[in-house]
Amino acid sequence: MYHDLIRSELNEAADTLANFLKDDSNIDAIQRAAILLADSFKAGGKVLSCGNGGSHCDAMHFAEELTGRYRENRPGYPAIAISDVSHLSCVSNDFGYDYVFSRYVEAVGREGDVLLGISTSGNSGNIIKAIEAARAKGMKVITLTGKDGGKMAGSADIEIRVPHFGYADRIQEIHIKVIHILIQLIEKEMVKA
């Protein structure tokens, strides 16, 4: 009954991944991002991650696999997803939703830390403000974006962009794969410490 639709969806996902893989700069950006994160951890820094909706879940997934585990047991790495409900509701109410991530970065971000901002459109105002706050703190910035990078294009030290202009779920599928590869590479870098 739905075999054609299922095949179509899987083929579109495979095509999106194939297009991402064609650009060697994406592979280089993933490697540079992993090394940047591992270097921050080795120097006593941490990563703060943020996103909205499904990207918020990806930010949480990234942090939990760093503090918990990915495939193998190892020491936890300092990662915080900006996801505390009381913080989010307080700042949304008192300052506006555009400030939910930047206020947290202002409070706990330090020079040597890294911000990972995830936005499929690249146009999330609250992540743009978080990037500005991270810059003011002397933090490095990595972004996972999609389409043409939106307003976030060019704002990060390292941008990993999925150049897909269809539905956001295709971009998110590549983002989660990139997140898993980042963690795998971070683990390899950390054993070099």
Swiss-Prot record:
Molecular function GO labels: carbohydrate derivative binding; D-sedoheptulose 7-phosphate isomerase activity; zinc ion binding
GO cellular component: cytoplasm
Pathway annotation: Carbohydrate biosynthesis; D-glycero-D-manno-heptose 7-phosphate biosynthesis; D-glycero-alpha-D-manno-heptose 7-phosphate and D-glycero-beta-D-manno-heptose 7-phosphate from sedoheptulose 7-phosphate: step 1/1
EC number: 5.3.1.28
Matching Gene3D superfamilies: Glucose-6-phosphate isomerase like protein, domain 1
Protein's recorded name: Phosphoheptose isomerase
Superkingdom of this protein's organism: Bacteria
Residues the entry annotates as binding Zn(2+): H61, E65, Q172, H180
Gene: gmhA
Chief location of this protein within or outside the cell: cytoplasm
Keywords from the UniProt entry: Carbohydrate metabolism, Cytoplasm, Isomerase, Metal-binding, Zinc
Protein family (similarity comment): Belongs to the SIS family. GmhA subfamily.
Record's miscellaneous remark: The reaction produces a racemic mixture of D-glycero-alpha-D-manno-heptose 7-phosphate and D-glycero-beta-D-manno-heptose 7-phosphate.
Segments forming domain SIS: 37-193
One Pfam family it belongs to: SIS_2
Keyword Isomerase: yes
Keyword Heme tagged: no
Reported cofactor(s): Zn(2+)
PROSITE patterns on file: SIS
Assembly: Homotetramer.
Catalytic activity: 2 D-sedoheptulose 7-phosphate = D-glycero-alpha-D-manno-heptose 7-phosphate + D-glycero-beta-D-manno-heptose 7-phosphate
